[in-house]
Amino acid sequence: MVMIATTSPDRITRRPQTNNVYGQIVAPDGLRPVVVALEKALGPGCVSMFNPRPGAPEVIRLRTDVADFESLALPGGMDHLFNGSVAGSAEDVAAFARRVSAAMVEAKIEHTFDVVNAGRVALTLP
């Protein structure tokens, strides 16, 4: 199933079926500061935090018209993978990743993002 994302009334882009942005976030104070930073950068309502089952680590889900990301806690609880797909050209994907990374930098959240294009890392942030 291919997800269709509308970026403007006259332009339709397809969100990739595989991830094209791979990230890692260090969150010693939990995921709430990450949610706040993401919503500040991308707008309210596009990020949710939930527990998938009792006793499981919290998960962040980011959904916009052009992006779909989800976190995965790594052993130890402070480090989280934050991978997802962004629709659009290579430049659009890089711009989205830069925007998210800038929000993390501003919030003093340690992170890394790799933007992948054609199977190769095209950009590493910050």
Predicted regions and their residues:
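Structured alpha/beta or helical-core interaction and ligand-binding surfaces enriched in interleaved
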Residues: 1-126
